[in-house]
Amino acid sequence: MATRKLYISIEESISAFQSKEKAEAYIFAMLIKASSLSSRINNPAIRSIKSILHIGNTKCCRALNNALKYEYVRYEGQTLVANILKENKDNVRPIFFERATRNQNGTLSCNVSFREMEKLIREQVIINHVKKQNLCEKTYKAVTEGEMNGEKLTVAQVKVYRRRKNRLSHTKEFHKGLSLAKVMGILQTSRYTARKMMRELVYSGKLIKNEVLDETSIDPKNFGRQARRYMKEIGYGGYFLFVNGKIMCQRSNVYICNDNLNAKYYAK
């Protein structure tokens, strides 16, 4: 199977997923890019676009109108062209898919479906988020504990990581792990879709999941009242487990990027 690589802008992808119609328009434009190296469709009648991209009439008309509205595509005479959807300052990641083929009658046939393109983009947005989170955690640990991957750092190395830390964005709160609520917020998706995607990323080996349990002081005999108080203190995120006679709280799962599998996804 011949594969093709296409770079996407993480910033533009996140922005597009904030509304359903914009996301549909964005994916439509990416499918046009995936259908040919020139990112264009000649003689773009609705029937022709439907045949190339393998989408229905209603979705095709709606996505085309929205793509024109958000300036993801434009007309150049008798040609429909997908605009450049990334800038030099953007954080970019590549997606890989099966190369488009040409039928016997000379027409193009895009070999990546609308749903598959949506999945590929969403996965790279989350992998990029986890990668940045891992980098921040490693940098802070190197500065505060003076070690990296169990090895003691030299004074010069700590200074390098301290300079890196100072270049990172600073917030009042530090969140360890990645909750489903955060994934839902980034991609504006349902809890079911977020959970399914994270499970598939872990199952494929692209992400490694570590479950983190926090020990609580909740007395099992007085669980109800103390549990409500505890949940109120932590912002109602997580759920309780009974482990070895103690009440534990599992909040966000910690994900680690599997560099062995994801190396090809990082822009050079």
Which sequence ranges carry the predicted segments?
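Electropositive, intrinsically flexible nucleic-acid-contacting patches
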Residues: 1-268
